[in-house]
Amino acid sequence: MVRRLARGCWSAFWDYETPKVIVVRNRRLGFVHRMVQLLILLYFVWYVFIVQKSYQDSETGPESSIITKVKGITMSEDKVWDVEEYVKPPEGGSVVSIITRIEVTPSQTLGTCPESMRVHSSTCHSDDDCIAGQLDMQGNGIRTGHCVPYYHGDSKTCEVSAWCPVEDGTSDNHFLGKMAPNFTILIKNSIHYPKFKFSKGNIASQKSDYLKHCTFDQDSDPYCPIFRLGFIVEKAGENFTELAHKGGVIGVIINWNCDLDLSESECNPKYSFRRLDPKYDPASSGYNFRFAKYYKINGTTTTRTLIKAYGIRIDVIVHGQAGKFSLIPTIINLATALTSIGVGSFLCDWILLTFMNKNKLYSHKKFDKVRTPKHPSSRWPVTLALVLGQIPPPPSHYSQDQPPSPPSGEGPTLGEGAELPLAVQSPRPCSISALTEQVVDTLGQHMGQRPPVPEPSQQDSTSTDPKGLAQL
């Protein structure tokens, strides 16, 4: 059983299949066929070639450089703040932080003091609760082994060797966000597509003082990349006061989608804004960082002011895609479109053979099996030999009145005017209708009908046309 199955699979593996054209006159099936072809054609023409521009060679991710510069002045309750104090880092890049609120721990010096109660397992009741030399990575210093009173209240915490007093959440609080919406941010951006050797920037080549009198407007000044901080936060869909209090990350996305088949003036940057940090996740929302300012008292004691800053971080993100006509993707997509049109024929074949195949009529018309004869004949092809009159009827169909062939060496001598046997008889002239009758008669022989024995030729044309080719 297994051997027979394997033999059948091996034999089927070497079969060759070729399409067979059948015309099915069915309007519903023809309508489905044309509609599928139309939908496929519309998909490739409208979406693939017009929307996706698949006839172009493309490049994504341009090489980009970004420079940022912030300007503006603000003030807290008792202090004026300028750019050098509230912008980090000061040199400007693709990431810039604008401080909007600070918590200040002043006059810290190296010494010993109570650990902050916000540190896990820092509270104690006696020295036994504090292990000398223990270091808590979430704390502010190394424990001395003593349990000391806290800065305020009746609680006690373990003493640490650190910058004292430690930050405990009761530091001075300064809000800088009152004037922050009017801060301006200049974003200089230039891009380069190396494949197409195309470069462009987001600042118009105009007078040198052009940037001193403009702010960004998509309609009137698209090449003046100076943005108000309040405008950026508003476009990101956020409340400025809330964002300035807790901090957050805003993304400025610059999109350079350029069709290089058009003029350079058609390649323009598109700006969009959105918040990047998770707003509704308390564990990870907001943005803050710490830094310190160091100084000496009396020239000997090193002192610092610790600042925990909350602010709005601006991340400038550049992406884009450039495309230009190329022959290779055009040919590939055209070939794909023409090949995909054949899906309609496949679908209609499935409908025809699955739902409309009554009495397996279409299956018999659709599929044929042709076997090559194991012992091919060396004679002429049947059709050609039949036309030329060179094929004899099968032996079983000879007339009973016809004498059998004489044995070898005993046959009569063929004299002048003697008739040739049928197998070697010269062809006689015939018309097209006679040829048709011969084809029908031959088909009748294969259906079991007795064919008539052809009569001898009335004229001997052997000498002039031995094979009767002139009569075709």
From Swiss-Prot:
One GO BP annotation of this record: regulation of synaptic vesicle exocytosis
Cytoplasmic side: 1-34, 348-472
Organism field: Rattus norvegicus
Main location: membrane
Role, per record: ATP-gated nonselective transmembrane cation channel permeable to potassium, sodium and calcium. Activation by extracellular ATP induces a variety of cellular responses, such as excitatory postsynaptic responses in sensory neurons, neuromuscular junctions (NMJ) formation, hearing, perception of taste and peristalsis. In the inner ear, regulates sound transduction and auditory neurotransmission, outer hair cell electromotility, inner ear gap junctions, and K(+) recycling. Mediates synaptic transmission between neurons and from neurons to smooth muscle.
Stretches the record annotates as Disordered: 393-472
Family that this chain belongs to: Belongs to the P2X receptor family.
Subunit structure, as described in the record: Homotrimer and heterotrimer; functional P2XRs are organized as homomeric and heteromeric trimers. Homotrimer. Forms heterotrimer with P2RX1. Forms heterotrimer with P2RX6. Forms heterotrimer with P2RX3.
Residue intervals annotated with topology Extracellular: 53-326
Name of the molecule in the record: P2X purinoceptor 2
A Pfam entry, by short name: P2X_receptor
Signal peptide interval: none
Presence of the UniProt keyword Cell membrane in the record: yes
Region (Pore-forming motif): 309-322
Known catalytic reactions: Ca(2+)(in) = Ca(2+)(out); K(+)(in) = K(+)(out); Na(+)(in) = Na(+)(out)
